[in-house]
Amino acid sequence: MKDLKHLIFFENLLQDAQNELVTQAVNDGKIALGYNCYYIPEVLLNLPGCFSSRLRAPRCESTDIATYYMTSRTCPYVRSILERAVEGGYNYLGALFGAECCAAMERMEA
C-alpha cells in the first residue's frame, strides 16, 4: 500500500500534457520534441539536449473549435489535439515530428 503514493504521482503527471516534469525540463533549457505516433524513430526523439513529449489532450471536454476547422467525422483524437493546440496547450514545444500514419493527422500537421 505504501507504494501507492508513487502511482498517484505518475497518475497526476498524466493529467496535463505540460506537466511538472515537462516544465522542469524546459526550464533546464532542454528542447521539447512533440510527436503524435509511436512510429517515429526513437533516435530522433532522444537527441542530446532534447526530450520527447507525446501529443495528448487530457481532459479535453469539447472540440468545438477543432470541428470548425475539421469535419466532425474526423477522429476524436485528432480533433482533441487540434483543440489543445489552438488553446495554446503545446506552446512549450520546440519541434514537432509527425508520422505518415493517419490522413487526418497529416492534414492537421501541414
Regions found by a protein language model. Give the residues of each.
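An N-terminal assembly and electron-transfer interface module characteristic of large anaerobic redox
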Residues: 1-110
